[in-house]
Amino acid sequence: MIETVALAVVAMVAVFFVALGAASLVVPARASRFLLGFADSPYKHYAELATRFLVGGAFLLTAPRASWPGAFSVFGWVLVATTAGLLLVPWRWHHRFARWAVPEALRLLPLVGASSLVLGGLVLWALFRGPDGGPGA
């Protein structure tokens, strides 16, 4: 049961990456507003951390069933570890960093969009291809 939920979470994250990539390329102003909204309140900060932790755990649980278990494990552990680090940082510091970093990233929005599309597609492919080249689910 938990593996099925983890698989669904990772699939939803992949679809999110595809949607973010498409929005970044087709409606960049809307994508920019969305990205600028992160970490601007304590609630959003902790919601982001909870989401990152959940997604990291889902990648770790899904890794054995994916085409690239090593990549899924590394990505999952990176999310879990950086989330733990962000838990130690006051949300105002995270907010200050986001106010600086997001506008810098938005200068490269077409690249962010294309990368997001590719990442989402690769995650979906790795999920549904599975570790032995067959369906992963």
For the regions a protein language model found, what residue spans apply to each?
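Hydrophobic transmembrane alpha-helical segments in integral membrane proteins
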Residues: M1-F17
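Core segments of transmembrane alpha-helices
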Residues: E48-F59, V112-G120
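A loop-to-helix transmembrane entry motif
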Residues: V9-M12, A39-R52
